[in-house]
Each structure stands twice: as structure tokens, then as C-alpha cells.
Amino acid sequence: MGNRLCCGGTWSCPSTFQKKSKTGSHPRPTLSILKQQQLWQNGTKDYETTAPTYEQVLYPPASQKKTSNSTSEESDLHYADIHVLRQIRPHSLHTVKCLHSESATEYATLRFPQATPQYDSNNGTLV
């Protein structure tokens, strides 16, 4: 997907399927930095552009490169204990009764009138 939101006119969009070259310890240039350098060379101001610029990283960060040493990956894991604290407010007797009645299970008994079966002598069935 990527950040290819603004392409058209004089804007050039790099292909997302291009093979990215690996770099050593050089800082990763971004599109906004390259665009600023291009604007500076052309003598135009940044606010004169017609569309907003979105920062897109041209090279993958070093942390995304896979290493064969799995123990170093495990040593980079950090776990955090998260505690959610909620202050309990005291309830009045009326509030407790209302809350209990709202969450209480209601039961009902349904009584249907008993049908008296009648025999139909023509068909030989109960009606």
C-alpha cells in the first residue's frame, strides 16, 4: 500500500515494487528531505507547492532486517505489566436496588387454555 496518496501533475511517485538497496550506517533519506533539497536547488519555497507532501521512507529501517541469530531477537523483547485501576464509588441503597432490578432475571409462567379434543366421526380424527 504505502503512502502513495498524491500522484499527478508534476509530482513523481516512486514505484513500490522497486528493489530497495541495502545501506550501511548512512542515514535514510526520505521523500520530504529529497523534495526540500530539490526545492532549495530550484529556488522555490516549500509553501508554493500545490499539494501536501507525505513522508515516505525510501529504505527499510535497520530494525526490519532479519538476522540469523534468534537469541538477539529474544533479548530485544520487553514485557510490560499493565494495570487498569478504577475507583469504586459508594452506592446508595436506592442505587443498589435499581442496579439489582435492572440486571435481575425475570421469570414468567404462561398458562394456555386447555383445548378439549373433539372427535370428528366423518373423518375419524380428533379436531
UniProtKB/Swiss-Prot annotation:
Signal peptide: none annotated. This is Uncharacterized protein C11orf52 homolog. Residues 51-75 are annotated as: Disordered. Keywords: Phosphoprotein. The keyword Phosphoprotein applies. Pfam families: DUF4578. Transmembrane segments: none annotated. The modification Phosphoserine is found at residue 63. The modification Phosphothreonine is found at residue 30.
